[in-house]
Design a protein with these regions (language model features):
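Hydrophobic core segments of beta-strands in well-ordered, beta-rich domains
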Residues: 63-90, 117-120, 132-134, 139-161, ...
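Beta-propeller domains
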Residues: 78-115
């Protein structure tokens, strides 16, 4: 089956892209059916790489993030980047950074119009040793819901300023809009944990996917039933292949992982891998992108893939277009995922 699988992000031109997004969300995006005069404050389409405003008219600030669907509402969590982007004097590589502000949260019924719910996991300003102090690094927050405990569990990559800590941080909340209470950090399975995501399978089991061993190997770790720590069962994948920014989804009983190479803030080639089981053997299909700038993933990096609830076989792949010298102004590239017959991704130059 591997050679016949396709992950298609098919965009022929910008106007058609808007129509595809509208089509995927039709039946979800009621605003698209309203007269123009009634939707003056609403977004009716998303253009990749352009500023995307929330319902207050401010640019959405949720970088490196992911979505959670709960009780009819989508929640978007991401790095809330504010303030000046700097390159530390001691830096030996382009580790541009902003001070940690926290994890921002937005809510939406239609995936187009997002209400800012606030900073649900804020920085801890009065303790320089805390993982969430502004001087540290907080990246790739993802939230999952535990049906057994009724808790919302956030996993994130937490770091020292020089990226030597390489830990996972966990926080818990009773509500999807927080506040999240920080539980601490650790190296899952005694291994480095940097770019990461979490995924809940149909049976309720949750997994963390994380770049480890100095970003050379992708670990997949089964979590405990409460989703708060590793169970001790894990696999090592893509050894010495240096993959990061994992985004995982399930289609037709198979598991897919979208990832990027490791080139700091600079874009690189994407890869799709597929497996029959999460803890089984992963087979790399190759670069899903075709067309202009395919070898740069259209100047973006994967972060999450979200099923569109209520739409059969409809998925949206989320990417960040990083601006390394102005990280707050990094933009979003969302693309529809269609599963048909070939493996490619097409998008015009933006």
């Amino acid at each position: 089956y591997l050679c016949k699988q396709e992950i298609l992000f098919n965009i022929m031109n910008m106007n058609r892209h808007c129509r595809i997004i509208k089509c995927i969300l039709s039946g979800v995006v009621c605003a698209l059916l309203l007269p123009v005069s009634m939707q003056a404050q609403k977004n009716t389409a998303f253009i990749p790489g352009q500023v995307w405003n929330d319902t207050d008219g401010n640019p959405i600030n949720a970088h490196g993030g992911g979505l959670l669907y709960h009780n009819g509402t989508y929640y978007w969590y991401g790095e809330y980047k504010k303030g000046k982007t700097i390159l530390p004097d001691w830096a030996t590589w382009e580790c541009y950074r902003t001070d940690v502000t926290g994890v921002g949260c937005y809510s939406s019924k239609d995936l187009l119009n997002w209400k800012f719910e606030g900073i649900v996991l804020p920085a801890v300003k009065d303790d320089p040793n805390h993982d969430l102090h502004p001087s540290k690094v907080l990246e790739r927050p993802k939230v999952i819901f535990n049906k057994k405990t009724g808790k919302f569990v956030m996993w994130a990559h937490v770091e020292s300023a020089d990226y030597s800590k390489a830990c996972a941080g966990v926080a818990v909340a009773d509500s999807p809009v927080g506040p999240f209470v920080y539980q601490g950090s650790f190296r899952p399975n005694n291994a480095m944990s940097r770019d990461q995501t979490v995924f809940v399978d149909d049976d309720g089991r949750a997994y963390q996917f994380y770049s480890s061993e100095n970003n050379e190997t992708m670990y997949i770790s089964l979590l405990t039933d409460d989703y708060l720590k590793p169970s001790g069962r894990f696999t090592r994948n893509f050894v010495k292949e240096s993959r990061e920014a994992p985004a995982v989804f399930k289609y037709n009983g198979k598991y897919y992982m979208l990832s990027s190479g490791c080139t700091g803030w600079d874009p690189n080639v994407a890869e799709i891998a597929v497996a029959d089981s999460i803890m089984g053997t992963w087979k790399t299909i190759g670069n899903p992108c075709t067309g202009p700038d395919a070898d740069k993933t259209f100047y973006a990096q994967s972060t999450y893939v979200q099923p569109v609830i209520g739409k059969k076989d409809a998925y949206i792949a989320m990417f960040d277009r990083w601006k390394k010298k102005d990280l707050e102004d990094s933009r979003y590239v969302w693309l529809p995922v269609l599963a048909v017959s070939y493996t490619h991704l097409t998008l015009p130059t933006i």
